Amino acid sequence: MNSRRKGANGEREVCEILNQELGWAVKRNLSQSRDGGFDIEIAQFRIEVKRRKKLMVQHEFMAQAEKSAGPQHLPIVIMRADGEEWLLMMKLSDAMPLIRDALPQR
């Protein structure tokens, strides 16, 4: 599978998860490859989807955070490369309440 198709499949997969979990019509930004923009927009969030065969280090970080947090707490990883800005990583299922709370009331 070429990388463009793999990326589009990942975007569709994330849209479907968000649609099911939030009950909100979430769609891919189809002009993003032409315009260089975000992949998905929902409320104030602009989402960039990355799908790779392996995300070895990031998954190791999350596994460590999950072990430390235990079942009663939310694991969050904050990381950065030297000279770069800090990044926050959490599981999509844990982020759903935050996204849901940010949606406009219908």
What are these regions (language model features)?
Residues 1-106:
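Catalytic phosphate/metal-binding cores of nucleic-acid and nucleotide-processing enzymes, i.e., regions
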